[in-house]
Amino acid sequence: MKSEFAFVALPISALVAPSAFAVQYLTVDQAQKAIFPGKTFSPAPVKLTSAQRKAIEQASGVRVLRDDQQVSRVTGGGWFIVDEVVGKHEFITYAVGLNADGSVKQIEIMDYRETYGGQIRDQKWRAQFVGKTSKSTLKLDSDIKNISGATLSCRHITDGVKRLLAFYEIALKH
């Protein structure tokens, strides 16, 4: 009696590929309601000029990766901005609510795609940004405490908020 074996080959990449880790914590609508409960929003997307881009980079010390910024004007004053930064390897999507005076009202982590470092979602860590303005230094390990095991995520969110505060001064403040 003859046995037949079917050989199924798995691609080598399937055997050695790292496991993907991505969690969507909040949609845009949910983040808007968390930061500005009861308010309404008017989309006000911004496309930066090269001069604005350079000015933001100079003011913040952080590179601007995109010319288009997803922004909404909040009824009664304020701004809601969705942004992305790279954690260690993957993008972190977050939202920043700015008061009418350009100070940080609140930040929310919307999508986190890294395997480690999700502790940046901790409310106590995010609260360190409340009240910060473009005049604030926003330095990790100085006025923003680092989280062990989440250093790159902490650094890049801090840099992203710093860049968005400069963005407010240069592109949104009227």
Q: Which residue stretches match the model-derived regions?
A:
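Bacterial N-terminal signal peptides that target proteins for export
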Residues: 1-8
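Cleavable N-terminal signal peptides
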Residues: 9-10, 20
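Hydrophobic or amphipathic, alpha-helical segments that drive membrane association/targeting
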Residues: 13-14
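Flexible, solvent-exposed loop/hinge segments and secondary-structure transition points
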Residues: 21-147, 151-155, 159-174
